[in-house]
């Protein structure tokens, strides 16, 4: 937990992001321990998490300084049946976790935290997840000035041209397509010797016309958070958390986080 907190507090002058999207959280008690014992400097409000249908018992969650605007909700993703007996897939996947917040000035932001079906699922399952995400975003955009989706999309470099560029980009601004042009990725596949942007932040293009609200994605702010030495191997690749042979902790996560800021423009 201390290492996770170190990475979070390394941003925004030691305060961490105003809104943090988290994946693979065990339960609300663990997240509250992280907030209260290790993230006091961030002054986050009580953690936000709803237990979902994941078979492994992991969920998406939020830490934020923004006030809630309504009750959080889970939106299930229905996956089509896999008829190939050689494919071992999960029967359920993580739901889309929605929480709505008040921005400075009173505008409403809808945040959709996601953790899409893993790579061993067929690509159709990630397509279905993208379709469901669009439905949820369209509904959220009826009341919110801006809708964000962020988390682990599990879209690797082989699927990215179809899923990110051809499908998602029609409805969303995607961090690594809008900015971060020199960024390599958030996850490294050692077997393929290739980076992937499994993780991203997306801003919905639909809903209330952008001309009618002042909050926009700032492409120049987009970057991969990987400057902390504890996050990386000597090669620069992500180093997942482990206890080494000497009993010492090493690493933080096998994914690097993504950072993005919204900018307020005059109407």
Where are these regions (language model features)?
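N-terminal, active-site-proximal structural segment of metallo-dependent hydrolase catalytic domains
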Residues: 1-38, 48-58, 246, 250, ...
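Catalytic metal-binding/acid-base residues of hydrolase active sites
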Residues: 25-26, 115-117, 153-156
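Active-site-adjacent helix-turn-beta-strand microarchitecture at beta-sheet edges
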Residues: 28-96
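Loop/turn elements at helix/coil->beta-strand transitions in domains of secreted/extracellular proteins
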Residues: 15-19, 42-45, 105-110, 142-147, ...
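Beta-strand-turn-beta hairpins that frame and shape the catalytic cleft
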Residues: 67-68, 91-116, 264-267
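Extracytoplasmic/secreted cell-surface and envelope-processing proteins
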Residues: 29-32, 56-58, 120-123, 156-160, ...
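Metal-dependent phosphoester-hydrolase catalytic domains
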Residues: 139-147, 155-267
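A long, amphipathic alpha-helix that forms part
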Residues: 122-144
């Amino acid at each position: 937990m201390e290492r996770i907190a170190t990475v979070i507090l390394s941003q925004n002058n030691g305060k961490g992001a105003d809104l943090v999207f988290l994946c693979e959280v065990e339960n609300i008690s663990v997240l509250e321990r992280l907030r209260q014992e290790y993230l006091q400097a961030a002054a986050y409000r009580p953690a936000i998490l709803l237990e979902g249908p994941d078979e492994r018992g992991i969920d998406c969650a939020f830490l934020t300084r923004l006030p809630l605007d309504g009750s959080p909700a889970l939106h299930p993703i229905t996956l089509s049946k896999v008829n190939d007996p050689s494919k071992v897939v999960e029967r359920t996947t993580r739901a889309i976790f929605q929480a709505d917040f008040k921005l400075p000035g009173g505008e409403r932001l809808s945040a959709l935290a996601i953790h899409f079906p893993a790579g061993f699922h067929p690509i159709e399952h990630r397509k279905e997840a993208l379709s469901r995400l669009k439905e949820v975003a369209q509904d959220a955009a009826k009341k919110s000035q801006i809708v964000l989706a962020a988390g682990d999309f599990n879209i690797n470099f082989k699927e990215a041209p179809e899923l990110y560029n051809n499908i998602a980009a029609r409805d969303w601004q995607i961090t690594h397509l809008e900015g971060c042009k020199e960024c390599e990725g958030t996850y490294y596949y050692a077997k393929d010797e290739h980076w992937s942007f499994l993780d991203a932040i997306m801003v919905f293009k639909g809903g209330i016309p952008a001309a009618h609200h002042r909050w926009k994605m700032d492409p120049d702010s987009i970057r991969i958070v990987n400057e902390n030495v504890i996050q990386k191997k000597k090669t620069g690749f992500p180093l997942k958390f482990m206890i080494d042979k000497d009993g010492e902790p090493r690493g933080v996560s096998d994914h690097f986080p993504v950072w993005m800021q919204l900018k307020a423009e005059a109407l």
